[in-house]
Amino acid sequence: MAIHYETKATNVGGRKGHVYTDDRALDIDIVSPAQADGKATNPEQLFAAGYASCFNGAFDLILKQNKVRDAHPEVTLTVRLEDDSDSESPKLSVSIDATIKNVISQEEAEKYLQMAHEFCPYSKATQGNINVDLNVNVVD
């Protein structure tokens, strides 16, 4: 199996600590969501940013492969930390909300969004592990 990319991140101090990547492109303080002050981030924000970016790349690729031009997809990913009835620790759930320009029908947009979900590496990694809601809006 060929590896397409590999990166490393190191955390010191957990949710009240610091995280950095091996190339220091990311080098930031970490806090728990309850202590967010705008000067540090938390694991849920980092997950949302990574998943949104990866998913939008997949969505844009699927649109282009299907000859949909000028759709200008935008993806907002909401990560929720919620109670888990099966465990004392919380669990994650996400909503993927995409918006594209009115160059295809709502039905086509939903089909391509589902295809992107099946293609996206983050979606593959979370499949069967977290609840994911998919939504797409076609706008003027």
Curated annotation (Swiss-Prot):
Question: What InterPro entries has UniProt attached to this entry?
Answer: KH_dom-like_a/b, OHR, OsmC/Ohr_fam, OsmC/Ohrsf
Q: Which domain of life is it from?
A: Bacteria
The record's SUPFAM superfamilies line, in alphabetical order, gives: OsmC-like (SSF82784)
Pfam assignment, any one? OsmC
Name the PANTHER family for this protein.
ORGANIC HYDROPEROXIDE RESISTANCE PROTEIN-LIKE
Q: Which NCBIfam families match?
A: organ_hyd_perox (TIGR03561)
For this chain, the family text in UniProt reads:
Belongs to the OsmC/Ohr family.
Q: What is this protein called?
A: Organic hydroperoxide resistance protein-like
Q: What is the scientific name of the source organism?
A: Staphylococcus aureus (strain MSSA476)
Q: What is the lineage of its organism?
A: Bacteria, Bacillati, Bacillota, Bacilli, Bacillales
